[in-house]
Amino acid sequence: MAVRLAKDTMNMQDGIEDGEGAADDDPRFRHEAWAAWPFSQLRTGFRNAEAFWREAAHVPGMTAHHDALTQFFAKQILGMMAPANWLASNPVVLRDAMETHGSHLLKGAQNWLTDVSGVPNPEVTSLPNRFVVGRDVATTPGKVVYRNRLIELIRYEPQTAKVHPEPVFMIPSWIMKFYILDLSPHNSMARYLVGQGHTVYMLSWRNPDASDARLTMDDYLHMGVMDALEVIGQQSGKGVPVHAMGYCLGGTLLTIAAAAMARTGGVAGTRNLPSLKTLTLLAAQTDFSEPGELGLFIDESQIGLLDNMTRGQGYLSGKQMAGSFQFLHSRDLIWTRRMREYLMGEREQPNDLMAWNADTTRMPARMHHEYLTSLYLHNALATSSYRVEDHTVSLSDIHQPVFMVGTQRDHISPWRSVYKLHHLCGAEITFVLASGGHNAGIISEPGHPHRSFQSAIRPAYGPWMEPEQWAKQAKTHEGSWWPAWQQWLAKSSSPKKLARTKTAGTSLGEAPGEYVRVRYAE
């Protein structure tokens, strides 16, 4: 390794840059100014150092987990030292400083002084007022038709004269507020489906407090998914199946529910639940053997540390959780952002997705421990050892058609990990690999620029294909994947009928409900 590093350094001094194209894959070095001397050598030297430490971090005798952890922290240190982060070594910043006669540097210094003095960033503190829930975001008309201790269930009003009989039930992750699926009117997935003639129900998780410390994964399954399904069945009519969709951990919970409902004996305590017609899983993992960088922070010692943190307060706070996600994506969420704020004077312009991301939620202590231990640490769902009501469930019992979406730059649910459902169940799977990341790749409405996706269908009980092989063979499409999904849902639905003008049952208030508005000062 040392010999190769020396050789690369000599080549760099001679103007030879092996793998020149690699720089184009790193957004920090895409600007044409990085091609000029001496910045091209700084860039190449940094790439050589990255390659060296990727290999040097491998220590014989270490477990795979600790080996990956060592590489991760080496990557973090290198990311901090990248030439793009510093005034004297970033040609884009230097050019900007000259063109603006230093005014952007002065503005950046003011931004830095504001941050270090502890004065809240006005761009962040103004988000709740700029993007008000129910006024600017989460505005799709509807009614709250059910409420318990843990959830509210929203039924959106029809926007077409006729609708498909089978409703679509949307289950977001409990880690964040549901309105990621109902952002602004132009990019609301719920509004889009309603506009295409679907009856849509949305699950809204309550933001827990210390009194919820003992809530379990089974509680989230029963009071969340099962109770909501029962209400949907009552309102839709006897014998009408449901298209169920889950996003992130909501999708993981949906697969648990589907497997439990399909096993012999079903789920105790549930009344006349409707059957599931199809499953849609968005950035949802079911096999956690390779969960990406998030898995680096999940082992016995880390879970013990988290348990100590949550034991006293009864929950994991939204601030604690948000810090972990920032650390995972430090290049874009920390260093590149700070470079633009402090060296170029550019504060990020607020948008609806930023407002949603800042609207954090808590997780009950016991449930948080159970989901980390059973899913991430023991990978119980993939090994058919996850227990519901003291009996195991197996994903091999799922036979409904599945529409599954992974995203290319997802650091929370890596697409290759999402793809592993192919070897866990024999159902027909339509797999979509969308451009973008965990959130932006999912909220990819028609008309959004620079969007594309690949897709292919694995027939029921079809042969296994490795992810890389799939990516080489799957057809590429320009634009949003939403229309393809909607067409898939429509094809699996009965012909449209006249929409009901009134919601069956008692209305508990207008959408988006009460639970989504609960915030805590943390």
Please identify what each model-predicted range represents:
Residues 163-174:
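Short beta-strand element of the alpha/beta-hydrolase
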Residues 246-250, 254:
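Gly/Ala-rich beta-loop-alpha elbow adjacent to hydrolase catalytic centers
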Residues 414-424, 435:
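Short alpha-helix in the alpha/beta-hydrolase fold that links the catalytic acid
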Residues 398, 404-406, 410:
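Short beta-strand/loop motif that positions the catalytic acidic residue
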Residues 1-150, 163-164, 201, 270, ...:
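Amphipathic, low-complexity, repeat-rich surface-exposed segments
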Residues 57-106, 234, 238-239, 253, ...:
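Alpha/beta-hydrolase-fold enzymes
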Residues 182-200:
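Short amphipathic alpha-helix adjacent to the substrate-entry channel of hydrolases
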Residues 212-236:
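Alpha/beta-hydrolase active-site loop
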